[in-house]
Amino acid sequence: MNGLSFIDDEQIRFPSPELALSEPNGLLAIGGSLHPKRLLAAYYDGIFPWFNAEDPILWWSPDPRAVFLPGELKISRSLKKSLKKHPWRVTINHAFADVMAGCAQPRKKQRDTWITQEIQLAYLEMHSQGHAHSVEVWMKDRLVGGLYGLAIGKVFCGESMFHRETDASKLAMMALHQHLLQHDFKLLDAQIMNPHLESLGAREVSRTAFLSLLKRYRDEPVAKSCWLPREMPIGK
């Protein structure tokens, strides 16, 4: 029987994602904290936190799930033109905190953000432990876009992206996609579909299918060099 579970500060493991509510879609549990062990346990099981500043911590595993499969990213004509026109530079793990701060800025027509100070501190700790990673897009020395997420084996769980220049977030996604292909990643989790993700080539799969892929690849080893800070080549 599906139902909302309440977790306390000591509880690390989560109920099965298949028990998540259908309305609101994917809500599985409430409570707990954003301790690194709990966050790792959540992503390992296909669960992620998503809540507003005034809410308790809410944990989700929606059905269907938005994902990118290897080789399915769509590169728009505008991005191809931008690659030729602008002196972009892309790095990995050079400015994680700045990328999170950029993602935390409220979007147009939004009063606030779900990327609260609590979220930022939790993922900064995950970054310091080597679990969370960022891609940065620069125009000369100015950060103009980027994204961040977590790596669980050969699955990358994307969290958020931002841009201050047209196409900068698309370039961050393209660079990440190329990087994941080079290191034989099998899945890029995008969580919940939206028009922007769909335009980039994301597809929806059932929660059951997503969890099957996650279980297959979450324990696959990745070279330590994969996430070393570096400048990333830009495929044109």
Curated annotation (Swiss-Prot):
It catalyses: N-terminal L-lysyl-[protein] + L-leucyl-tRNA(Leu) = N-terminal L-leucyl-L-lysyl-[protein] + tRNA(Leu) + H(+); N-terminal L-arginyl-[protein] + L-leucyl-tRNA(Leu) = N-terminal L-leucyl-L-arginyl-[protein] + tRNA(Leu) + H(+); L-phenylalanyl-tRNA(Phe) + an N-terminal L-alpha-aminoacyl-[protein] = an N-terminal L-phenylalanyl-L-alpha-aminoacyl-[protein] + tRNA(Phe). GO terms for molecular function: leucyl-tRNA--protein transferase activity. The keyword Cell membrane does not apply. Keywords: Acyltransferase, Cytoplasm, Transferase. GO terms for biological process: protein catabolic process. The keyword Cytoplasm applies. It is found in: Cytoplasm. NCBIfam families: aat (TIGR00667). HAMAP family: Leu_Phe_trans. Belongs to the L/F-transferase family. This is Leucyl/phenylalanyl-tRNA--protein transferase. It comes from Shewanella amazonensis (strain ATCC BAA-1098 / SB2B).
